[in-house]
Every structure is written in structure tokens, then in C-alpha cells.
Swiss-Prot record:
GO terms for cellular component: chromosome; cytosol; nucleus. Residues 108-430 form the USP domain. Its main location: nucleus. Its EC number is 3.4.19.12. Residues 516-547 form a coiled coil. One of its GO terms (molecular function) is cysteine-type deubiquitinase activity. It comes from Caenorhabditis elegans. This is Ubiquitin carboxyl-terminal hydrolase usp-48. Gene3D superfamilies: Cysteine proteinases. Recognizes and hydrolyzes the peptide bond at the C-terminal Gly of ubiquitin. Involved in the processing of poly-ubiquitin precursors as well as that of ubiquitinated proteins. Required post-developmentally to restrict the plasticity of epidermal cells, probably by regulating gene expression. Keywords: Chromosome, Coiled coil, Hydrolase, Nucleus, Protease, Thiol protease, Ubl conjugation pathway.
Amino acid sequence: MTKETDKKPKERPNQRKVAFRNEAINALVNTDEDQVTFSKAMEVAKLDCQKCLLHDMHSSKSSNCRDNPFCIHRLGLEKFEKLITQEQETKEEAKKDQKRRDLNDQPAGLINGGNFCYVNSFLQVWFNVPEFRQLIYDFRPSENFVPPEAPRMNVQATMLALQDIFYTLQTTPFNETDKTSNLGKLLRLNSEQQDSQEFGLKFFNALERCLPDHPNGKETLKRLKDLFTGETCTRIVCKCGQRSEREETAISLTLNIEGYCTLLDALDAYFGEEHLDDFKCSKCNKTGDVSKQSDYVKLPPVIVIQLNRYKYTSKGRQKLKTPMAYPREIPAKAFQRTNNSIPPPAEMYDLFAVTIHEGNNAECGHYYDLIKSPLNQKWYRYNDEAIEAIPKPPGTEKPTTAKTEKSRKKDKEKYPTDQKACYGLLYRRRDAFKPLPHPKLPPEELIIDSKTEIEELFEGLTKKKIEKSEKRLYDLERRINKVKISYGKLETHSDKYKEANEVVFLPTTLLQDVLAQEYEVAKGEKKKKKKEASENEEKKKNEEDEALSAAIAASEADQRDKASSEPSTSAAATEAGDDEELRAESETPNPENAESTQVAIMETDEIMDTTPTKDIDILAKAMEDNALPTVEVPQPELKKRTRQQNGEVKYVYSQRTPRKSHNGTNGTNSSPQKQPVSSRVAALLSSHEIPTCGHGKMSIDPILYGDVKAVSRAPAIALLREYDFRVKIVYDNGENVFPENEKERDVFIFTAEDICMECVREMREEGNFNNQLEDDEKLVRRILKEEKQRCSVKCPSERPDGYLYVAKFALSNFKKSAMSARENRLAQSHNKQGTLHFDSHPMFQQKSNSGYLTLSLKRTRGKPRKSLSEIPEKMQKLDEIGSKELPDEIIADEEEISENMGSDIPTKPVESINPDALVPFEKIEFNSELRCSHGGINFNQFRLSVSPEEWAHLKVYFDECYEVKCSDDVCDQCRQMEVDAQNGSENMRGLVREMRKRISDTLKTVESRAESKEDGADIKYGICSVFIDKLRKLTSRQSTSPPSICQECLLCPHQQPFKGFLNEDNHKDSHVVGLTEEEWNTFLTEIRKLEEAGDDQSIAVDPCPIPIENGQIVDMCEKCFEQHIKFTEEQKYMFENENIYVKLVNLNVEEDIAKANGKARRGRAKNLYAIKMSSTNKLMELKVQLYDKTHQLPNDQLLYRTAGGEQFDVSNNQKTLFDLRLSPNNNDNPLILIAQQFSPSASQADETGDRAPERGFVDTALAH
């Protein structure tokens, strides 16, 4: 029996549909019965409407017109206009992309092919130093240079690689380039992430060591040192006058920023006096009078400042997130303070680059730069290949101090990101001449290869992109025009058709589904194009594009796909060959869903290469309206290759090995190679249905509701044929019928002639019924209001002859009962009610010579795919668990399809009647409430008297009525039973009150002894705790059922006690309560008295006492007792949708370890996760939930029962929580999950892994 909580809430009726139906009913009610003809039915169904002008206007909003059954506008066709507009914009964008990058306004980025953001950051900063770029351009290779042996750096190859990178960045027409891979190989950089500032320092040191070994390297090294190398002087001064100085070369400044918030404050601390308390003067031999100070003696043109953003603590190295305010211009005296023997050429230094380390700690992050262009003086954000202008320059306009920053913090002004994460600052000396000179490019012989490669790649890609966009736009416009023409032919109205059989009905959802799937297929290419691919996919795609572009540049004629089977002069031939190859590889029946089919279709379209635009016009003349063309490929199959001979491109055709089929035979190309677009759409369509009336014909209700559309017959049948729809009728009793195709009907479909006239007449009867019922309902309400005058109890006076009694309950439910009776009568005559199903039939393609059949990728409609495993999808993804075998349901479906191949559609009904559907209707008998179980008049029901005329109005709605005359007497047996019950209840209430007074003290003594757990020496017997609870809750209102002393819940099947006394584990279960002999006799005597008073015929049964000696239960059944204890213990671990608490503990934090199993509220709440689980869930499912919260992979999680206790490793993943004995709501003793940190593997190519700054380049060329 269904619980009330499981019942579905009653659905509210659609008021719009009710209004349409009531409008039709009112029209029929106002019509005489002899005038209800077929013409009137057509009028009521609104099939006499003219063309709908309300929705003929263009609108981007979809809406189903329910006022006019002929209106098929705005079902989804309007979305195609937007798609064409987007494709036209894409075409224009492709033409714009043919324009070269503005070399003066848009910098080019560097693609990050691995964990090389630190290399890109270094290169992009120093590329924007014109002096350094010119220095690289001026380097010349030498034939006399002998490359050193590994691991020493090949300085010539390195300088030429830098030259190639800088030249490409300066001249490439693309917005990004990938030129860092060659430099990484020369420097033997691994895939680990490194520190950007350390890389720059190591790189310049390596150049200093290796350039002197090159014939042309000494001049380059001198210019390099003059650019960024300065000289500092460290002075140690004593108060006695002793003074010592030491000069050294300085490449960069490393500032400690802990405790400082501005760059000037950090510089003051760096260049300020430092007192050496432990230093002893060699002259005066005194300690504590010595000071140390550093200062610049010679300032370089470019000053590099590195901000030390990490510190060492007891917890390891931590990143400093201190905001650092730095100025856009800084005076030279901030660096050169005391020694002015060599004054700087300029008084100011301007900020031109900021290196930013983005990340939460010192072990992980990502580098990017903010750089000022030396050409246009604009600021840009260089984030690998993404380069964008920033509206506001970084830094502060003027130098600030700590005092200024304190007022800023007081005003609660937020710090910008560049100040919170700046890691390196670069300042350039402000010289007298501006702008800076544009670097002169290297000689032509050094850059000719790169120049040619860039030009060929740009011309090939842009031309290919434009032609592909033009073809896609043409195909899209052609397909959309075809859909518009098809739907235009479908539209009809009263002026266009002459006979009713010229109008057919199609489900509105079918028309919408066709348009929706046409739209999805049409936008498939664009959607896939805009979808953001992963980094590995992008890299692969770039390699393929480069290879294809090189082939295009080698020959202007080689614009077709290299995989095409034979050269052709039309785009259709090229597309057909590509499509055939893709389809041949996927001919094996594969249980993929419709979404996978759509993705495959989109990928097929992407593989198709582009043909010249002039061929599209030739193709347009040969195309038909209903499908894309198919091309027969002649034998033998030839494969086209290009070969360069004497500077000219030659085409060589060689016979390709025939593709082998799945059964080992060679396949042929006799079948068409191009799949029509309509077949692709059919693979995505769902099932649709039209409800049939109870007479097996077309009901008028779907027409009124707008659920079906009236369309022209011939175009409708053509539409169903194009998308391969099949129909069947499924009756409510489970019978399936495949109707025969009638004359001139390729597909069975309802026409206007099939409108059921019986249902139309029933609608008229329904209107009359409702009107009459409304009048009689007023009569019923009047009878109920006159209850005092009509009730047999409130007005016991004698009634006139012929008056009858009606149950008050029957009158209260009169309207509902009347409508149910009518529905039952209709249901008995409506034995053919069901639905007409439209299902897109699976397509079959048969190879002529291969000897096997292939199925389409489309799944059976209405049957969703079942999961290949009971493990959740997320678990399959994480642990790569899953089966590649086909589900049994899929195999069964395909076997059934294969058996029916080649046979015609069944024309006879399939005997599949469901016996459960043939349930007899319940008969409704009006006023049956007054019939008692003895066959007389029920004494317990309220009865209201009605006149014979009123009774005639009431009984007309029912086939069966129970007449009760007012003169008839009620059932004597029912009357006597009521009297006895009343008298017995009063006596029992009094006895209960007296008994409670007598046993009150005894009951309190028993309860107090049970709570204190005292072992009384006088305890002789045991009684069930359930009886004590019932006795305590007994009141005078429950007098009719006094509790009995039943010991069954304490006795096992061996009639021995198996439950013990009260303890912590069984406080919710029944247990033994100890009683003295006097207490036992008191309870037994009082209950006997109540039982005897309640029923004189009752037979007294002595309860079975449970003897107790010396506080122990006698004759305890040990076997059953052990089983009961085991069952009680297991009950703790059986739960449904309860919380499992898991605490995340970091072993590096002593506080976490101390509070891992803490009892304090704050200790428990820290890093505590509550996860809803059931005892039947597996441990893997719990770990998957923890993965969502902690991002630790399930198989890597260190999960323990307690801190230092049992570990739940991988071997326990498939065990349930019940098997592992995990109790719910364990917030006092949660599971322990150890926090972990993972470092990236060598194969990872993202920038989100761990980074360890300044850990060196030991294994690279920079260290030798």
C-alpha cells in the first residue's frame, strides 16, 4: 500500500487548455443535436481559420500559437537567421584576420609549450629593451667557432636562437608565436618550473663565461655589461677614523621587503648604515663602534630590482604577500647617495617593466609581466601568448613612504594586484633623446629562412580560413533555405484545402524537434570552433595547421584534403571522400548516445577541407533540394600525392589498398559516400506522440490545446519520409498495433476526416451534464444547509410518506461521485484509447560485397542508455574504472533489429496486452454508506431526509442507488453495539482512575530504581519495559484497551529470556525491569481486574514470569543473547542519509595534530567536513565526495579511522560503510584525512603545479 508521503501531488490543470475546451463545449451546447455535423466539428476545432497574421511578423522569440491550428510560425525557425548573421560575422572576421598585425600598436606573445612561463617572462621583458635587442641583432656567427662539448652552452647557437625569437616577435603578422622550444633545447631546460629572476641571472652569467670564447663575442659582452652592470662600493667605517672600501660588480638589487610597504623604505634600509655590534676594529681594537654602508658608484642604464617575497619560518618557506608601493619614476640619488665621483647621466629612472608572481605561496604560481612599449609608450600585460593593453600604468605617480601608505590604509583603499604580487621591477635611465631608436634588423642572410617561413604560414592559413568560412556559410544558407521551403509547403488554411483529407495532424513537438536538431547540426561547426580546447589539444592542432599550411604554400593547387580518395573538380567529391573514410572507420555498432553522434557529425564537418570558392557555384547547380549530393567513386581508388621535380609540382596517383571490413574482406565503394544532412538530423530526433480518443480516432482536444498542428498532407508525408519516421499505435491496455499504409499514404497519419464525431457528441453531452450538475449541486448545498430540519438526530419528528434518507457523507461528495460515475461509463465504452507514436526509425545501410550490416549511431527512442557500471560517473573518470562491453539491453535491441532486417513493417497487431491494464472499473453506488454490515440501515451515519422529487434529481447520475425510506427502522444489532460501547467506556474510565491511584507509589519506586541502576536484594521477577511504559502513559481516555503483561518480546523461540537489564546500548530497545514479589503481584492483580471489567467472557492467562536471583536473570539463553547483542551492535552502523564527519589534519602543523581528536568545540569544528552518506554506500563514494572538497584524488587519500589508527587504503574502496563499521553523526570522533601537497610530474604542461623559486639549474647548460 502506498504511503501518503509517497503520493505525488495532484497536478494543477492548465487553465489555458481548460478555457479552450470550455469554449468548444459552450459552442456545442448552444447547437441543436441534429446540427452537430462534421462541418460543425471542423468549425469547433478551428479548422475554418484563415492564415494566421498574428505571428507572421519576424520575431526572435519562439512561441507556439494555440489560437490557430494552422499557424506553424515561431516554432524555432527564427533562430536560423541569427545563425546566418553569426556566420557572416565569422566570415568578415576571417577577412579581417587576413590583415597583418599592427607592428607598432599590438605586440606579439610567446606560446607556452610547457612549464616555461619564466622563460617567456624573461624574453618579453628584455625584448622591450631596445639596446639589448639591438645587441642581439648585431651578433654575427663565425665559421671559426668550434662548439664546445656538453654540458657547456653553445653560445653561437644560443645567440642565433635569441636573434630568431626577437626577429619573429618584431615582424610576425600573427598575434603570437612559438619560438622558445629551440632555446629550451639548447639550454637543456627540463619541464620543471623555475624562478624567473634566477633564470635571468644565470643566463647573463652564462653569457659572460661563454662569449669570450667566440670570435665575435668580446664586443657583444662589452656592450652587454655596459647595459645592465653597475658598480657598488661597500664601506666599513669606525669612529676612530679607520676606513675600508670594497668595490664589486652589481647585476641586480635583491631587496628584503618584510616590514616595509614602499620601495623607498626598502631602499633606505638597503643603502642605510648598519651597525656591526660584533665587529672589532683592527686599529683601535674596540667592538661596537663600526658601521657598514653600501652605495652605487656607477649606475647602469637598466636597473633590475628583485623583491624577496618569501621568508623561512618553523612551518617552512612562506610567501610574503606584503603590498609594495613602487613609483613610476625614481631619482638616481635613491641608488647613488654618497659617492658622486661618477655622476649619473640622467637624474631620473623610469619604470618600464614589472614581473608579477601570481600564486598563494612560494611553492606554486605563474609569472606574467606588465611592460611599457619603448615605441608607443603604452603599457601592456604580457601573459605568455595573451597580450592586452592596460588602461592605467602600474605603480604610483610619485615616490611614497610608509607615512603616506599608513594614511592610505586608514582610508581603507584597496591595493592593486600589481603591488600585492610584484616580484621584479626594472627601471630605465631617462636619457635626453626620445623616443628610443628602433632596432636595426640583422642582415638578410641571417633572417631569410624565418622570414620565408612566416610569410608562407600567414598566407596559407588566412586563405584556407577564408575559403572554409565561405563554404560553411554557403552550406548553412542552402540548408536553412531548404528547411524554410519545407515548412512553407506545410502551412495551409481554410482557403488552400478543399477536402478534409488534404489536412493532416503532426505533433507540435515533432515540428519543434526537427527545427531544434536542424539548428544543432547547423551550428555544430561553429559551436565546436568556439569551444575552448585544452592545452595539449591546442598544441596538436597547431602542429597540424603548420604542416597543412606548409603543404598549401608549396603548391597553390594543393588545397584539397590529403586524405581524399581521388582528385575531383567539385567540393562534393572532396567532402564525400572524407565522409566515407570517417564513416568506414565507425561502422561497427557502437552504443553511443545521441550527443556522441552529434559530436561525430561536427568532427566530420571539421575534417572536410575547403575547395576554391569558384567550385561552390558549380556545386550549387548540381544540388537537389532534399539532400546533399552523393558521389560514386570509380575503381581503382587512387591516392593523390605531391612531388617536387625540377622546381615544379607534380601530382602522382597511386592505387590505395582497399579498406578492410570487419569480417576480413575488402570493402568496396559502391554505396553513396555522402550522408544526407536529414539523416544526421534523424539520428538526433526523439519520439513524439498524438493521443487517440477512446474510439481509436483523432481526438479534438489536442487540436484545441495546440498540441498538434494542421498541415498539408503531401508535404507532411514528405517530411516524415525525409527524417525516416515510423508510426505505431499503443493502446492503454498494452496492445501495440502497426497500422497499414493506406492508399496515397506512405506513412499512417491522422487526417481531418479522422476527427471522431462520437467524441464531439460526447463533448456536447458533457456540457449539458455539467450545466445540470451545477443546478443539482445547488440543491445539494441547500439540503446540507437545512441539516437541523432534515437530520434524523437533530429533528427526530416523523417525515411525510415517500421521503427518503440520504447519508450526509454521500451528499458532501455528491459532485465528485457523479463525475466519477460518468467517467466510469465512458471508460467502459472507450476501449481503444491510446497514443499514436512517431519514432525516427533507425537507418540501415547494407554493404553490397562485404556481407555484413551496419547500424546507425542513433539510439532507440524513449530508452535512455543505462550506465555501464554502478560506480558513479565521476569515479569512472578519476580511477579509469569502466567496462567497454555493450550492455545486455543494447545487444538485445540490436539482435532484434538484425532479425527484422529486410522484412516489412508488421501490419497485424502484436499480442502484447498487459493484464494489469485490464482492471475492472469500480462501480459507484450512491448512498451506500447507509447500508451496515448486517444488511440493515447503518446506525452510525448521519442521515438527512429528502423528498421524492429531490431524490429523483440525485439518483439520475448513478446506475445504482441504495434507497432508504424514512419509515424504515435502523439495524437493532448496530444500535445495541453502540449502547454497550458507551456503557462499557464509562465503567472503564472509572476503574482506570482508581487503579492509577493505587499503583502510583509502586510505579514511582520501580522507575526510580531503574534510573539509579540499584541491584535490590529483594528483586525476584523481571517484567518487560514496554509494559511499564504503557502503564505510565495510561490515562482514562485509553480505558478501552488496558495494557496486558506480555513477556514475548523478552523471550526467545526457546521460551527463555535473551534480553538483559537496561544499559547504554539498549535504552531504545525493550529490556528487563526488575520487580519485587510484592510489586509483581500488585501489577498482576490490577491488570486482571481491568481485563475482567472490560470483557466478562475473557479467559485469564497467567503471564510467564522471568525469575531473577542475586541480580542475575535465571535460565538466560546464551546463544540467543549473543545473537541479540550482535544485532544491536550492527544496528549502530545501519543508517540512511546521515552525516559522516571527516577532519582534515596537516601533519606539519602541531596545532592540528593536538586537536585531531579533540573534544573542544573549536577543535572539532576546524577543517571538519560533513558528508551525507548511507551505510550501503561504498568507501570510494565517500572519497569522491572528499575529492570535491579537498581536491585529493581518491586513491591518493590518506584516510584514517582515528589519528594514528586504522588506515582505509585502496583495498577498502569497494567495501561499504557498514562493512567498515563506520557510525553516522561521528562529529565527536571524526575520520582523519591527512593533508597532502603534490608536485607536478614531468609530463604536466600547466602552470598550476608546485614551483620552488631559486632551486637552481644544476642539470642545464646555464650551470657550466
